């Protein structure tokens, strides 16, 4: 669990997301409150539930990115799902409990990667020994100790230096059992898991001799050895705890399941999805193949643009489960300028790095960046407002010629992206509303 203070969390988010300080503060406080809860006595800890958040703002202003970066900072299991994917129980489609099942799968994957990284050196040593056993089978009647100290060490050195990478060897590797996909109704995942385990056990522990290059064999054997070292039962128990105590669910498009006075039809199903979400957000127990998961302390961050509906159109019970409301601001020209330059991996830095691979120096001037920001803002105002995503479209169109011709240009040529260059490439399209609707 992250022990970052709210100020540290906001500063870390500032490296990737421009503006939206209110939203950053809200999620930073929510993250810190988790740490505070874990410092409380056991009996009080169970009573303190997370204060779920509702983010309100147009598309492309940073709602999803804030939640995604927060989960990375917290090193917490995180899942982003669209509320529109789900249907009311009784209708054909996914039921909302699959959110928690997917979250547990994410936690298992995350913890397995962490555990494998920790055991990497042990697994590599074991893989080296298995490959050396193939390269240097012990001689009959020879002294294995003597061999180990001389020839084996020479070969180990060659193996580590990559001198044997392209040598082909015959090695016994695990024979992966045939995958069996079983379709079952929602809620029957436990039975599916048991059946799949039964089928896979028929082919488990089998090895197969295969001819492979040393570098490929090393990679496969290392993964096999790492899998042997990971304690699966402990991993599952830790994943369940991580989900229950630190899980974050990002519910996008929540406004699309809200009632609206302007829409008619389909309201029953929409309200049904909200009612199904209620117990999940409030706290219930969900059955998964890894055990029962309590959702009482999972943090839910809901978001929506609320163009055609208002937060008050959500059913009152769900409104009550989302006590923290944060409005995100629409982006201005200055915001666009900052987005182009300030983030640690900003779009301009990405394009400069991509051009560098072709030995081209791409130079964005200050007035060029200002003009790009202006065009992105103008097109958003005149057509559909898609927020910062508009910059991707504008930059791709702007640098299309450079991207196409870069490999034909002389090495170390500098291309200056000035305001004049931007107008030359985009001016006509940006001014013509009909064209910009289709191209930008």
Curated annotation (Swiss-Prot):
Q: Which UniProt keywords apply?
A: ATP-binding, Chaperone, Cytoplasm, Nucleotide-binding, Stress response
Which GO terms of the cellular component aspect does the record hold? HslUV protease complex
Entry superkingdom: Bacteria
- Subcellular location field: Cytoplasm
Pfam families found in the cross-reference section: AAA, AAA_2
| HAMAP family given in the database record | HslU (MF_00249)
Entry function:
ATPase subunit of a proteasome-like degradation complex; this subunit has chaperone activity. The binding of ATP and its subsequent hydrolysis by HslU are essential for unfolding of protein substrates subsequently hydrolyzed by HslV. HslU recognizes the N-terminal part of its protein substrates and unfolds these before they are guided to HslV for hydrolysis.
Family of this protein: Belongs to the ClpX chaperone family. HslU subfamily.
NCBIfam families per the UniProt record, alphabetical:
hslU (TIGR00390), PRK05201.1 (NF003544)
Q: How does it assemble?
A: A double ring-shaped homohexamer of HslV is capped on each side by a ring-shaped HslU homohexamer. The assembly of the HslU/HslV complex is dependent on binding of ATP.
In Swiss-Prot or TrEMBL terms, this protein is called ATP-dependent protease ATPase subunit HslU
Query: Which gene name belongs to this protein?
Result: hslU
């Amino acid at each position: 669990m992250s022990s970052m203070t709210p100020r540290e969390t906001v500063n870390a988010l500032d490296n990737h997301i421009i503006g939206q300080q209110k939203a950053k503060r809200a999620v930073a406080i929510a993250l810190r409150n988790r740490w505070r809860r874990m410092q409380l006595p056991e009996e009080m800890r169970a009573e303190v539930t997370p204060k779920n958040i509702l983010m309100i703002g147009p598309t492309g202003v940073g709602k999803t990115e804030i939640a995604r970066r927060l989960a990375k900072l917290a090193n917490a299991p995180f899942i982003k799902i669209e509320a529109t994917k789900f249907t009311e129980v009784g209708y054909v489609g996914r039921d909302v409990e699959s959110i928690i099942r997917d979250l547990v799968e994410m936690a298992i994957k995350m913890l397995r990667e962490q555990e494998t990284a920790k055991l990497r050196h042990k697994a590599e040593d074991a893989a080296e020994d298995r490959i050396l056993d193939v390269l240097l089978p012990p001689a009959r009647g020879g002294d294995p100790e003597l061999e180990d100290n001389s020839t084996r060490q020479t070969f180990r050195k060659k193996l580590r230096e990559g001198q044997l990478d392209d040598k082909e060897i015959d090695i016994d590797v695990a024979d992966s059992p045939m995958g069996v996909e079983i379709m079952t109704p929602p809620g029957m995942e436990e039975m599916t898991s048991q059946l799949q385990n039964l089928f896979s056990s028929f082919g488990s522990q089998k090895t197969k001799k295969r001819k492979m290059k040393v570098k490929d064999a090393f990679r496969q054997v290392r993964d096999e050895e790492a899998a042997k070292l990971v304690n699966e039962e402990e991993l599952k128990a830790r994943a369940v705890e991580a989900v229950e105590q630190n899980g974050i669910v990002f519910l996008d498009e929540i406004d699309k399941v809200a009632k609206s006075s302007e829409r008619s039809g389909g309201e029953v199903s929409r309200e049904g999805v909200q009612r199904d979400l209620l117990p999940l957000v409030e706290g219930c127990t969900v059955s998964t193949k890894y055990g029962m998961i309590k959702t009482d302390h999972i943090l839910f961050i809901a978001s929506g643009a609320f163009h055609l509906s208002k937060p008050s159109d959500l059913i009152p019970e769900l409104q009550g489960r989302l006590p923290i409301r944060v409005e995100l601001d629409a982006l201005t020209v200055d915001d666009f300028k900052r987005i182009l330059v300030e983030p640690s991996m900003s779009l301009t830095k990405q394009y400069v790095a991509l051009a560098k691979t072709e030995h081209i120096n791409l130079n964005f001037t200050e007035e060029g960046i200002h003009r790009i920001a202006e065009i992105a803002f103008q097109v958003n105002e005149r057509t559909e407002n898609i927020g910062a995503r508009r910059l991707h479209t504008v930059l791709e169109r702007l640098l299309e010629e450079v991207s196409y011709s870069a490999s034909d240009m002389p090495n170390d040529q500098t291309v200056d992206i000035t305001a004049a260059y931007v107008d030359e490439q985009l001016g006509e399209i940006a001014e013509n509303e009909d064209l910009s609707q289709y191209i930008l």
